[in-house]
Amino acid sequence: MLTHPRWTHIALPSCDLDASIAWYEEFTPHVVLDRREDDDGQSAWLSHAKQIENPFVLVLVMFWRDKGKRQPIMAPFAHIGIEMPERGDVDAIAERARAAGCLSWEPTDMPPPIGYICAITDPDGNVIEISHNQGVYAKVEEVWGGS
């Protein structure tokens, strides 16, 4: 039973849902959780596989009326952040993104609490930051204590 508010999802438009799903499965740890279709369009929910506790879902929505029209929402600096367990994970994603032509920010060490980051751009022009050793969860633990 829900006892307190929580983040659940962010929804972004997609001009080509299948291409976006393929991109997120290639360049992030996200996989399809659910797909839906109705008279207005299609949507897909993506999240980390089997993350049952505190999942966060990326909802991609392709409205039929906007099919084929890019609508970048998270750009040029606005972004979604994904933290990876290893620094090498950031480098591996950056290498694949560079080869695919979608690397926005080269991997770089930033001062604490930012950590080691790069950014990639999805098929709709949205920026996704990939990081390692970012201080977001550490700050939550420091301020509000463990779970």
Residue ranges and their predicted role:
Residues 3-6, 73-77, 111-112:
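Short glycine-enriched loop/turn motifs at secondary-structure junctions
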Residues 57-58, 127-130:
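Short glycine-/small-residue motifs
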Residues 61-63, 67-83:
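Helix-adjacent hinge/juxtasegments
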Residues 2, 11-57:
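Core segments of cupin and vicinal oxygen chelate
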